[in-house]
UniProtKB/Swiss-Prot annotation:
Keywords: Developmental protein, Differentiation, Glycoprotein, Spermatogenesis
Pfam families, A to Z: SOTI
Function per UniProt: Post-meiotically transcribed gene that has a role in late spermiogenesis; required for actin cone progression during spermatid individualization.
Protein name per Swiss-Prot or TrEMBL: Male-specific protein scotti
Region (Disordered) location: 11-57
Residue ranges with Low complexity bias: 14-24
Protein origin, superkingdom: Eukaryota
GO biological process: sperm individualization
High-level lineage: Eukaryota, Metazoa, Ecdysozoa, Arthropoda, Hexapoda
Amino acid sequence: MDPRLYRLIRFPSNGLGNNNNDPNQQRGERPRQPHPDLGWILDAPNEPPRNRNPLLYLVTAPPRPRKKRSFMTTSKPFRIQTNVSDLQYNAWQAIQDAPPEKRCEYYVKYMDEHMNSQNYPNGVGLPHRWGQF
């Protein structure tokens, strides 16, 4: 740029506006230009403010793949084995559909129909005492 034109335009030396008390302009010198290799540093955007919120600047890792579950290792509900015979268990299952007021009658009818010599010949399979299968 032509120095005469530069003096006519009167560029501010430090970017703070038109400063007539600038010693460089009073002596007729050009303001110092930064070194050309430093241009890329001066043009760089400002860094984000530090220690404001450190969680905003954390780099999150990609999510880890979930472990595939095997049907052999998944837990199943444990069914408690009680001291109830198959006849008692089947009778209990049968009366679940009955209304609560008539469950006693349904139980008696079920035992009358199913606890007979056809289902249990010579009493084989019937419990001899409570808790025995």
